[in-house]
Amino acid sequence: AAYEKFIKTVIAGSPKILFQHKLFSILKKAAQKNPLSLVCDMNGSARATSIDKKFIPESGISFIPFNEDKIVHAIIPEPENLVHCAQKINELQKEGNKSALLGYMPDCDGDRGNIVYWNGKEAKTVPAQEVFALCVMSELAFEYWKNPDTKNLAVAVNCPTSMRIDEICARLNAKVFRAEVGEANVVNLA
């Protein structure tokens, strides 16, 4: 229960229960209008015991996990391992599950691109730099959605991070700060 409370706070960007309720109500209504199934390649191990199985359906999104019992491929969610998730989405689409539009493979430390999407014809993986760009864009947009008067937003990144982050930040009036390579350097800069 405590972890679910924490996750809702992180997703909503607010500890306020009423705000969280509003956000998750919007999500549920959107999922009712446009059904979505989220496909997850658990690839065995402890990932199969995550809160995703309970939490995602409670949010109005169908959850389709597979490879829950044993590790069947390398654990790093990079394109060569995400093909399994893409294959599963392709199978579901072929079987008539038109709501199977997104998939992922859990990434224990969150530093790899791990998203698969249906492009209307086949499932494709999203390159890591694009996943990060989408994350930056959605986080900044969400901050403005919560508070349209938000000012002084910033993003801390490694020096070699794609320049598309600069473009996104420029459009959303946020500053980019670059650190030397290394997660600790970025965290310290932030």
How should these model regions be labeled?
Residues 2-190:
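Phosphate-binding chemistry for phosphorylated carbohydrates and sugar-nucleotides
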